Amino acid sequence: MKLKKILMESNVWDRKFGEKLPTLADVQRKFEQKKLNEATRWSVGIEDPNGKVTSVYGHYDGYPEYVGKLLKKHFSNPSLVKQLIKLGKSGISTLGKKIGKKHDFDMPYDEKEKLGYTTFYGRDRGEGGNFTQVSKDRTQIKTNSGEEFLYIWSVKDKKWYYKDEDWPNKRWEEL
C-alpha cells in the first residue's frame, strides 16, 4: 500500500491496464521533477555573535521577493526569529506577516494571507520530528532538502542576510 501511495504522489500510478509498473529509477526521477516544480524551498536561521547558526526548513515561496521581503519587514527582531525557529522545528510551510495562532493547516491560502499567519508543519498539522540544524558557522549550513535560498538573521549586525544556493560561489548578501 505504501508503494502505491508513493507512485500516486509521484504521478506515475496513472497507467493503462496491462502496462508495466515503472522502475524505481522512473519513480525517483518523476518525484524529483515534481519536487522541483512544486516549491521554492528555503531555510531560515539565526546567527549568534560567535557565528553559530541555528536554522529550520521552509517549503513554499522562498524567493527573496517574497520570503526575504517578509523576513526583513516583519521579523527583524531576534525574539521573533527565535520564535519562528522554535515553532518551525518540524518545518515551515508558508511564511506570513506574523507568527499567528494555531490554525487549520488546510485553511485556504486566501484566508491565511488575510490573517497574515505563518503555517507550521508541527503546530498546524501536528507533524513530529525536529529538523533544526545547528552549524558552527555560515559555511557549514547544509541544504538537505533542496533549499534554494538561505536566510540568516545576524544578532551581531542586527541585519538579514541571504544566499542563493543555485550559485554556490556567491557570497552572502544583505537583504
Where are these regions (language model features)?
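Cysteine protease-like catalytic core of ubiquitin/ubiquitin-like
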Residues: 66-72
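Low-complexity intrinsically disordered segments
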Residues: 74-175
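Short, flexible beta-strand-to-coil junctions
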Residues: 46-51, 59-62, 144-145, 153-157
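A short local loop/turn or secondary-structure capping micro-motif enriched for an aromatic residue
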Residues: 62-66, 169-172
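Charge-dense, intrinsically disordered terminal/linker segments
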Residues: 1-39, 49-50, 101-102, 136-139, ...
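His-enriched metal-coordination microenvironments in redox/metal-binding proteins
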Residues: 35-43, 59-65
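Catalytic phosphate/metal-binding cores of nucleic-acid and nucleotide-processing enzymes, i.e., regions
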Residues: 46, 55, 63-66, 80-81
